[in-house]
């Protein structure tokens, strides 16, 4: 086994580095949970100028944690510096929706963030860059960032559906009294929005079909909306948005992308036209990770019930794309 001294250091950029999600995310990265426990990491923290003090405090705490794999921390408000040589990037920082703000305005305002970041990635990142967009509206933010990075394959940009995927597993595990690791072949199709479609059609637990174990009415009337609206539920109960679970899911996504997995996961990737979903949008699909790339699980039979929900997501994502057409 290689020692850390003989393995090249991976540079990881995190935007919105002073925020709550990053406060959970950065410790996991520094602990080797993305690239493995033998690979040193260098963290590059990007923040807006008025939040650099907060990022400095985060960096101080990271250093105080004395992670054996953590080689260096850069704190900057300059996107070109932040993405210089980056092997992985978590785009966490985004503009939240203001009270009474239309979704089109939210998309446009975030385009002003993710477009320039995409260009900085295009101009400065390493050839093997992997970009995970966490900041919402994540699917269309990923589209905007990718469009601004014409020299980077679109497949190197993803939007996070793993939180929705993990929420779906959690709801099933609670319902059936089983461990989360026992579930396989769950997928969340579409958009990271209330329209998303958490799908248990192919899911199994301990070799049994989940659809044989739960009532269809519970699935449609409770499970699907509960997963789709879990974020709002947490805000109502906690008074704050779900940050630690988002960070944990981001780690899951990037780890599986880098290290590979044959287990099904939900990842928002550029549509290839699979399952009748139009190209030109970033959409949650059933995937496995092989050789550092997500591959769509092909050949699944789609019922009319599924088709309607998948199509609703595709239409919503196409509408979002049209709203930011001038940024693409």
UniProtKB/Swiss-Prot annotation:
GO molecular function, one term: L-malate dehydrogenase (NAD+) activity
Entry-linked PANTHER family: MALATE DEHYDROGENASE (PTHR23382)
Keyword check for Magnesium: no
Protein name: Malate dehydrogenase
Organism name: Corynebacterium glutamicum (strain R)
Entry binding sites for NAD(+): 16-22, 110, 117, 134-136
NCBIfam families: MalateDH-SF1, PRK05442.1
Binding site for substrate: 97, 103, 136, 167
Family indicated by similarity: Belongs to the LDH/MDH superfamily. MDH type 2 family.
Top-level lineage group: Bacteria
Keywords tagged on the record: NAD, Oxidoreductase, Tricarboxylic acid cycle
Function per UniProt: Catalyzes the reversible oxidation of malate to oxaloacetate.
Protein EC: 1.1.1.37
Keyword Iron: no
GO biological process: malate metabolic process; tricarboxylic acid cycle
């Amino acid at each position: 086994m290689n020692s850390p001294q003989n393995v090249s250091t991976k540079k990881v950029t995190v935007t919105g580095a002073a925020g709550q999600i990053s406060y959970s995310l950065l410790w996991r990265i520094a602990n080797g949970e993305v690239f493995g426990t033998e690979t040193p990491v260098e963290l590059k923290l990007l923040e807006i100028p008025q939040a650099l003090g907060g990022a400095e405090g985060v960096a101080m705490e990271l250093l105080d944690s004395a992670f054996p794999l953590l080689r260096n921390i850069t704190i900057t408000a300059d996107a070109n510096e932040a993405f210089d040589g980056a092997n992985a990037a978590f785009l966490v920082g985004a503009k939240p929706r203001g009270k009474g703000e239309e979704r089109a305005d939210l998309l446009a305002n975030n385009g002003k963030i993710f477009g320039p970041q995409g260009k900085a990635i295009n101009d400065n990142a390493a050839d093997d860059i992997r970009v995970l967009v966490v900041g919402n509206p994540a699917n269309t933010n990923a589209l905007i960032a990718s469009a601004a990075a014409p020299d980077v394959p679109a497949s190197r940009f993803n939007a996070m559906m793993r939180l929705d995927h993990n929420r779906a597993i959690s709801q099933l595990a609670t319902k059936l009294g089983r461990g989360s690791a026992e579930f396989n072949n769950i997928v969340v199709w579409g958009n990271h929005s209330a329209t998303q479609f958490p799908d248990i059609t192919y899911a199994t637990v301990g070799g049994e079909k989940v659809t044989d174990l739960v009532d269809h009415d519970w699935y449609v009337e409770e499970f699907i909306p509960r997963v789709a609206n879990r974020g709002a539920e947490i805000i109502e109960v906690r008074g704050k948005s779900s940050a630690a679970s988002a960070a944990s899911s981001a780690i899951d996504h990037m780890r599986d992308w880098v290290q590979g997995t044959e287990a099904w996961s939900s990842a928002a990737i550029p549509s290839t036209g699979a399952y009748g979903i139009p190209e030109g949008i970033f959409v949650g699909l059933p995937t496995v990770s092989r050789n550092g790339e997500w591959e769509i699980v092909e050949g699944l039979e789609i019922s009319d019930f599924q088709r309607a929900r998948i199509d609703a997501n595709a239409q919503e994502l196409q509408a979002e794309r049209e709203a930011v057409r001038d940024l693409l």
